From Swiss-Prot:
Entry EC no(s): 3.1.1.32, 3.1.1.4
GO MF term (any one): calcium ion binding
Pfam entry (one): PLA1
Gene: pldA
GO CC annotation terms, alphabetical: cell outer membrane
Taxonomic placement: Bacteria, Pseudomonadati, Pseudomonadota, Gammaproteobacteria, Enterobacterales
This protein's name: Phospholipase A1
Protein's organism: Salmonella typhi
GO BP term, pick one: lipid catabolic process
Quaternary state and interactors: Homodimer; dimerization is reversible, and the dimeric form is the active one.
Required cofactor names: Ca(2+)
Catalytic activity: a 1,2-diacyl-sn-glycero-3-phosphocholine + H2O = a 2-acyl-sn-glycero-3-phosphocholine + a fatty acid + H(+); a 1,2-diacyl-sn-glycero-3-phosphocholine + H2O = a 1-acyl-sn-glycero-3-phosphocholine + a fatty acid + H(+)
Membrane-topology annotation of the record: Multi-pass membrane protein
Protein role: Hydrolysis of phosphatidylcholine with phospholipase A2 (EC 3.1.1.4) and phospholipase A1 (EC 3.1.1.32) activities.
Length: 289
């Protein structure tokens, strides 16, 4: 299985580069592509009806963490030999199911985001994947241009989110949420807020909102060709949260050099209640702009 995954990773990420930057597109529904707008991008119609669109960022980085949550994976026969250095990568794609479902600037869409932490250098234990989070979504999105105090609201999105690590007990972690995502931009600034409401069972992680809160805030700043980004979640009642800061810069037309720092709780589902600081550097195919 690991050999298959190693082969699939480059085969999956490389074709995505073709869609990471602006392509020759045909404007539809009077909603031209807008920098940083997921929904306006999905309203663009390519010649290929099976085109996949970036949803979140797509990257691959080599990382090292201040501490490793060995207790959470103690049932794995290799847990004591787990290493602090890992390859972390994220694949995030979206597909429009129905453009114009509720008007010319609306779309019914689906997305899939996968984030993995791979013990690549741990050859002694056959380089296992310590954790992988699978996050499919179904959503209704609107591209807008409402203006207020210099800001333009670009995306309004409402949907259902499932997030799971695909494990069985005792390492199973999952939760389901209804969410709203709002994205606005002002010049070189982008701000996105995504509040959510947890539904269904959280028996695997009953206190997850204690550490992950009820919303995510994302901020981006376009500095020349570089993009500085920050996102995080915080529970004001408990004082727990986590934040990620990233900086990317283009090195070719389709590839960006990317540096990332994550600090706090909730970097992954298995680490939702574990505090750490992780630093990584690698490549990215598309940033939030």
């Amino acid at each position: 299985m690991r050999a298959i995954l190693r082969g699939l990773l480059p085969a999956t990420l490389l074709p995505l580069a073709a869609y990471a930057q602006e392509a020759t597109i045909k404007e539809v529904h009077d909603a031209p592509a807008v920098r940083g707008s997921i929904i306006a991008n999905m309203l663009q119609e390519h010649d290929n009806p099976f085109t996949l669109y970036p949803y979140d960022t797509n990257y691959l980085i080599y990382t090292n963490t201040s501490d490793l949550n060995k207790e959470a994976i103690s049932t794995y026969n290799w847990s004591e030999n787990a290493r602090k250095d890992e390859v972390k990568f994220q694949l995030s794609l979206a597909f429009p199911l129905w453009r114009g479902i509720l008007g010319p600037n609306s779309v019914l869409g689906a997305s899939y985001t996968q984030k993995s932490w791979w013990q690549l250098s741990n050859s002694k234990e056959s380089s296992p994947f310590r954790e992988t989070n699978y996050e499919p979504q179904l959503f209704l999105g609107f591209a807008t241009d409402y203006r207020f105090a210099g800001w333009t609201l670009r995306d309004v999105e409402m949907g259902y989110n499932h997030d799971s690590n695909g494990r069985s007990d005792p390492t199973s972690r999952s939760w389901n949420r209804l969410y709203t995502r709002l994205m606005a931009e002002n010049g070189n600034w982008l701000v996105e807020v995504k509040p959510w409401y947890v539904i269904g069972s959280t028996d695997d992680n009953p206190d997850i909102t204690k550490y992950m809160g009820y919303y995510q805030l994302k901020i981006g700043y376009h500095l020349g060709e570089a993009v500085l980004s920050a996102k995080g979640q915080y529970n004001w009642n408990t004082g727990y949260g986590g934040a990620e800061v990233g900086l990317s810069y283009p090195v070719t037309k389709h590839v960006r050099l990317y540096t990332q720092v994550y600090s706090g709780y909730g970097e992954s589902l298995i680490d939702y209640n574990f505090n750490q600081t992780r630093v990584g550097v690698g490549v990215m195919l598309n940033d939030i702009f």
